[in-house]
């Protein structure tokens, strides 16, 4: 135990001695009250001189470096001038906006197109009906009765002059009967006033066309009215009554006046011109001709001129 205590004391003494030696050798480890002002504080005024020289040498060089920089900044404005490409988008958007308002006028053009196309169609029908009515001759029934022999003569194609095939609807009469019809026609035609002869001959041709139309319609209706034979037969009196009922409205329409089709108007003009060449020459009668002032639709001729 004594030896241990002795070693401990020696160790403590050694450590204290070592600590004192270190504090004496190293000035920073001294106690604050034992520290003395360091002499190197006098070197501080020399540093500003060195720093001023460095500043005088470095700062004048910096302006030269800054003078080199303006070209770099001057190069940027053109780059900034290239940026106005972005504001070019508004005019592009304006063009798009201008294109869109062009659609309403296009839709406005489409809407008015339909009414004008529908309105002229009934107007054309009305004009066609008015022109046809103007071409239908208006003659007293008594005059038509007087010229009935002329009508039969033309309808039966008794004249040697070539007539349209549509006039020859029945068998040709004998030469004697044709001669009789010719004499009767030439007796009645001079009795008609001279100013009414043209319209009278035109009315004869018009009545022939209506008779042909009536015959065609009657044949079509008779074919439609014939019942299909499916084990049932319809009596003849019933068929006759049906035909009579079907013919009555036709006769009423013909009596009131039937509108001619475009091809019938052309037929009326052609047949009238042929009749005006035959009858005056055959009967030695003067028939004054008048040119119609109204134009016929669908490319049909404008009436018969004076010969």
From Swiss-Prot:
InterPro entries: Bifun_inhib/LTP/seed_sf (IPR036312), Bifunc_inhib/LTP/seed_store (IPR016140), Glia_glutenin (IPR001954). Keywords: Disulfide bond, Repeat, Seed storage protein, Signal, Storage protein. Pfam families: Gliadin. Residues 31-88, 105-126 are annotated as: Disordered. SUPFAM superfamilies: Bifunctional inhibitor/lipid-transfer protein/seed storage 2S albumin. Residues 43-88 have a biased composition (Low complexity). The keyword Signal applies. Expressed in endosperm, but not in husk and leaf tissues. GO terms for molecular function: nutrient reservoir activity. Residues 1-23 form the signal peptide. The keyword Chloroplast does not apply. Coiled coil: none annotated. Disulfide-bridge linked aggregates. Glutenins are coded by several genes on each of the group 1 chromosomes of wheat. Glutenins are high-molecular weight seed storage proteins of wheat endosperm. Thought to be responsible for the visco-elastic property of wheat dough. Belongs to the gliadin/glutenin family. This is Glutenin, low molecular weight subunit 1D1. It comes from Triticum aestivum.
